[in-house]
Amino acid sequence: MGDAESTKDRLLLPVERVENVTWSDLRDGSFTVELKRLIFFAAPMAAVVIAQFMLQIVSMMMVGHLGNLSLASASLASSFCNVTGFSFIIGLSCALDTLSGQAYGAKLYRKLGVQTYTAMFCLALVCLPLSLIWFNMEKLLLILGQDPSIAHEAGKYATWLIPGLFAYAVLQPLTRYFQNQSLITPLLITSYVVFCIHVPLCWFLVYNSGLGNLGGALAISLSNWLYAIFLGSFMYYSSACSETRAPLSMEIFDGIGEFFKYALPSAAMICLEWWSYELIILLSGLLPNPQLETSVLSVCLQTISTMYSIPLAIAAAASTRISNELGAGNSRAAHIVVYAAMSLAVIDALIVSMSLLIGRNLFGHIFSSDKETIDYVAKMAPLVSISLMLDALQGVLSGIARGCGWQHIGAYINLGAFYLWGIPIAASLAFWIHLKGVGLWIGIQAGAVLQTLLLALVTGCTNWESQADKARNRMALAYGT
C-alpha cells in the first residue's frame, strides 16, 4: 500500500515549468536527437504498415485472376468491410495511443498490459454486432441496388472475413502494446513472416482448395490470426515485456469506461475521414461515364492510401513519443517531438508529391493500359500530389492529437471539414459546375485543407505544461483506481 501511495504522490508532483520551445531553443542538440529517434521508429513502422496493407492487396490480385465477377465481388466486400468494420476497430484501438502511451511514460508499466486486455475485451464485444452486419451483407447490398450476382458473392466473401475481424480485435491492441513501448522489431519481424506465409497460403486456398474467391477471404482471416498469435507469444515469453505483462484478472473490467471515453471519439476521428473518401467514390458512380470516373478516382485513392503509410508511421512515432513524454511530465520534450515530427512530415510531403508530379505521365500506366484512363490519371496527378502533401501534414498532426488525447477535438474537426465543407463543395463542383471527377477531388481536398489548418491551429496554441499536468493527473487517478 505504501508503494502505491508513493507512486500516486510522485505522479501528482507538479510538472517543471518551462517556457514554450522556440526554434532558437533547438540548437542544443535535442532536436537532432529527437529527429533521429523518430526516424528509427518511423522507418520500420512504415514497413510494418505496408506489409499489413499488402495482405488485402495480395488476396485481391489472386482473386482477380478468377474472373471479373470474383474481382468485383471481392472488391465490393472488402470496401464494405473496411468501412463498416476494420476502420472502426482501428479507430477504437487508437484510444491506447493516449492511455497506454502516457501510462508507459509515467512508468505504470503493469497498467499497459491491463489496458491491452481491456481493449481486446471491448473490441471483441464490438465485433459481435459488426459480424451480424457482415453476415447479412448480401441483403444490404441488394437494398442498395447492387447487382444480385455480385451481391451474392460479396456476401459469401464477407462471411469468410468474419473470423479475421475478431483476430483484428486482438491484433490492434497488441500492435499498440508494442508500439507504445517503442518495440518495433517484433512488429517488423512478425508482419513480414506473416506476409511470407500469406502469399503461398492465399495461392493454395484460391487455386487449389476448391474455395475459389472465398479462399482469398479465408487467407486474410488466417493471416490475421497468425499475426495475433505471434505477437501474443512474443508478449508472453519475451523478457522485453516482463515489466508490462499483466495476468488476466477482473481488473480488466475496471478500465472499460476509461477505454470507451477515448475509443469512441478516436473511432469517430478515424472513420469520419475514411468514410468521406469512400463517399466520393460512390458519388463518382453517379457521373456521366461512371466506369471511367470511378476507375480514375479509385486509382487516385489507391495511390494516396499506399503513400499514406509513411505519414502514418511518422504519426505513430510522434504519438508514442508525445504520450510517453507527457506521461513522464516532460512538457518541453513533448514540444520538441512536435517540431521534429512536423519537420519529417514536410520533408515527406515535398519528396513524395514532387516525385508524383515529375512522373505524372507514367503514373497511369501502373494501373491501366486504357489510353483514356491513362490520360485522365495524368490530368489528375497535380491534384493527387497536393493530396499527398496534405496527407503528410494532417496525418502527423492527427498522430500528435492522439498522443495528447485530443480525439474528441479531432472528431469535431473532421466532421466539419469533410461533411460540412469538403463534400458539399465536391458535389457542387462535380454536378452543378460539371467538373465531374476533378470537381469531386477538388472538393474533398478542400476539406483536407481545412482539416489540416484546424489541427495545426490547435497544435500551435497548445500549452504543453498544461497537457503534461493533465496526463500526470489522469495517470494518478487511474493508478488510484
Curated annotation (Swiss-Prot):
<dbReference type="GO" id="GO:0015297">
    <property type="term" value="F:antiporter activity"/>
</dbReference>
<dbReference type="GO" id="GO:0009507">
    <property type="term" value="C:chloroplast"/>
</dbReference>
<feature type="transmembrane region" description="Helical">
    <location>
        <begin position="187"/>
        <end position="207"/>
    </location>
</feature>
<feature type="transmembrane region" description="Helical">
    <location>
        <begin position="117"/>
        <end position="137"/>
    </location>
</feature>
<keyword id="KW-0812">Transmembrane</keyword>
<keyword id="KW-0813">Transport</keyword>
<dbReference type="GO" id="GO:1990961">
    <property type="term" value="P:xenobiotic detoxification by transmembrane export across the plasma membrane"/>
</dbReference>
<feature type="transmembrane region" description="Helical">
    <location>
        <begin position="380"/>
        <end position="400"/>
    </location>
</feature>
<feature type="transmembrane region" description="Helical">
    <location>
        <begin position="38"/>
        <end position="58"/>
    </location>
</feature>
<feature type="transmembrane region" description="Helical">
    <location>
        <begin position="214"/>
        <end position="234"/>
    </location>
</feature>
<feature type="transmembrane region" description="Helical">
    <location>
        <begin position="76"/>
        <end position="96"/>
    </location>
</feature>
<feature type="transmembrane region" description="Helical">
    <location>
        <begin position="267"/>
        <end position="287"/>
    </location>
</feature>
<dbReference type="InterPro" id="IPR002528">
    <property type="entry name" value="MATE_fam"/>
</dbReference>
<keyword id="KW-0472">Membrane</keyword>
<keyword id="KW-1133">Transmembrane helix</keyword>
<feature type="transmembrane region" description="Helical">
    <location>
        <begin position="438"/>
        <end position="458"/>
    </location>
</feature>
<dbReference type="InterPro" id="IPR045069">
    <property type="entry name" value="MATE_euk"/>
</dbReference>
<protein>
    <recommendedName>
        <fullName>Protein DETOXIFICATION 12</fullName>
    </recommendedName>
</protein>
<feature type="transmembrane region" description="Helical">
    <location>
        <begin position="415"/>
        <end position="435"/>
    </location>
</feature>
<dbReference type="Pfam" id="PF01554">
    <property type="entry name" value="MatE"/>
</dbReference>
<comment type="similarity">
    <text>Belongs to the multi antimicrobial extrusion (MATE) (TC 2.A.66.1) family.</text>
</comment>
<dbReference type="GO" id="GO:0016020">
    <property type="term" value="C:membrane"/>
</dbReference>
<feature type="transmembrane region" description="Helical">
    <location>
        <begin position="154"/>
        <end position="174"/>
    </location>
</feature>
<feature type="transmembrane region" description="Helical">
    <location>
        <begin position="296"/>
        <end position="316"/>
    </location>
</feature>
<dbReference type="GO" id="GO:0042910">
    <property type="term" value="F:xenobiotic transmembrane transporter activity"/>
</dbReference>
<feature type="transmembrane region" description="Helical">
    <location>
        <begin position="336"/>
        <end position="356"/>
    </location>
</feature>
